[in-house]
Amino acid sequence: TTQIPRSAADDFQPDVTADTHVGAVPSAVPPKRPNADFAGDPTREPIAFDSPREPAMDSAAPEDDIHLIPGASIAGGRYRLLVSHGGPPALQFWQALDTALDRQVALTFVDPDRTLPPGQVQEILTRTLMLSRLDKPGIARVLDVAHTGSGGLVVSEWIRGGSLKEVADTSPSPIGGARAVQSLAAAADAAHAAGVALSIDHPSRVRVSIEGDVALAFPATLPDATPEDDIRGIGAALYALLTDRWPLTETGAPSGLQPAETDPAGEPVEPRAVDRTIPFQIS
């Protein structure tokens, strides 16, 4: 692969080019970055929206299969898909354009391949609905939760910044990384107090905002997610920022992070063993 110079994390602005317009379908090779990561961007201003409601089991009649490709329009043309961000099994994460409000959003498709029982899809949506009550920098604001003809859809605000992999590639300082994950830990604490887990189960779930907060960018709580899983996920996010590697088992679409090196017992080596400059207290 071609090596490119690493920029400072504070200079990192990873979104689609400024020539993306409402009504224009991206080319076959979609822009890699949306144009939202700039100070004063109106997409960060509060907008009026109906609070997410409990999704009904007897939703509308099944639609044709949704083709999740860049440029595709869904929900009657309301959202245009821009960039796929992967995801664990049964979920797909997309960056999209809300064509009605001309702002970027994060879309989480729940069971788009229809492999889960309907009751399990309902449980995911019900748990995710509980996250809509949280207002923390460490979680994207949930704007809508709904059934579709092929599963479910969670619409969230778009976290401007970079993916965990992109920011880890800039070699942020250990202290900066430790501070950044505090926002995710605070969001998890609030979610656990409300009786729900965040489901931090995949590197692509997490983004680092331009404000420097590590956040759950694609909310959708799986039925088997636990607070203990979240604690491991928070630790894994910090590990990735420190070492550019992922210490947990990764399933689903690859995030680009390499797996962590392991010790003779099969456990991930401590970050300090990878980089001796990492303070012992953080490692």
Where are these regions (language model features)?
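Protein kinase glycine-rich loop
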Residues: L81-P89
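Catalytic-loop of the protein kinase fold
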Residues: A188-S209, D213, F218, P223
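Activation segment signature within eukaryotic-like protein kinase domains
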Residues: A180-V181
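Conserved short submotifs of the Hanks-type protein kinase catalytic core
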Residues: G149-S163, S171
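Activation-segment/catalytic-loop signature of the eukaryotic protein kinase fold
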Residues: V145
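C-terminal lobe helix-coil module of Hanks-type protein kinase domains
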Residues: L222-S283
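Conserved N-lobe loop of protein kinases adjacent to the ATP-binding glycine-rich P-loop
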Residues: G87, L97-Q104
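AlphaC helix of the eukaryotic protein kinase fold
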Residues: D111-R133
